[in-house]
């Protein structure tokens, strides 16, 4: 089942001096089970769009179809709990969502809230705390005694513990060390591979190149491109015009070509770049 947005607009504080357009006539369809990246300059509407996926914000006009639900401006709050069981959001600095006395209780809260038994909630919490890499000896600690990176892991375990069909993540690996970042992004890719949809809000174009199947690029609340990573990154002038960076591998490939090494294809990731260099050197295509 696809995720569909039809003529969706959102206006902040309509009719007031503070009125501002958050989303402007968005039309797109996303295939479920994919890893989708939302990109755009600061203020482009990424976080506003993310909050529409589970009706935390409802459109001012237009229609959204997601997880078997239809969301319009007239949609009430009744029944949204089940939608939010299926579609979960993890905000930037998700550690601010922590509130329980212990790590374990905090991660158990989501499953319990959505009908898990006490034993089921505990089992789910322990499973996901292990998956996010938190040590067993920390589960009875207060989450507020942990480091920032550990708190981030606990918060993410909390939204993964009830295994929503669709998870929306706003810069989830920001602030983690390089190894922690790699582990966390691989966790999300594995979650997608298990049959879920992952929607990632990010400024990190390496993550887009490495993990995304599909990209939505926003600017001033408008959808300016919906394409694969290769399509999005093939035009460096377009990227510069819209204040979007290229992946590091693409930038390095451009420097190599400027130095006279002709590379096959369009390498966007480090493995692709390494393969392209090997092929070029093997074929004697460098000058």
From Swiss-Prot:
Positions of ATP binding: 40-47
One example GO MF annotation: ATP binding
Domain named ABC transporter: residues: 3-245
Keyword terms, alphabetized: ATP-binding, Cell membrane, Membrane, Nucleotide-binding, Translocase, Transport
Protein's UniProt keywords contain Electron transport: no
CC terms in the record's Gene Ontology section: ATP-binding cassette (ABC) transporter complex
Cellular compartments annotated: Cell membrane
Matches recorded under PROSITE patterns: ABC_TRANSPORTER_1, ABC_TRANSPORTER_2, CBIO
Top-level taxon: Bacteria
Keyword Heme: no
Family: Belongs to the ABC transporter superfamily. Energy-coupling factor EcfA family.
PANTHER family: ENERGY-COUPLING FACTOR TRANSPORTER ATP-BINDING PROTEIN ECFA2 (PTHR43553:SF27), HEAVY METAL TRANSPORTER (PTHR43553)
Complex and partners: Forms a stable energy-coupling factor (ECF) transporter complex composed of 2 membrane-embedded substrate-binding proteins (S component), 2 ATP-binding proteins (A component) and 2 transmembrane proteins (T component).
Cited function: ATP-binding (A) component of a common energy-coupling factor (ECF) ABC-transporter complex. Unlike classic ABC transporters this ECF transporter provides the energy necessary to transport a number of different substrates.
Name of this protein: Energy-coupling factor transporter ATP-binding protein EcfA2
Lineage start: Bacteria, Bacillati, Bacillota, Bacilli, Lactobacillales
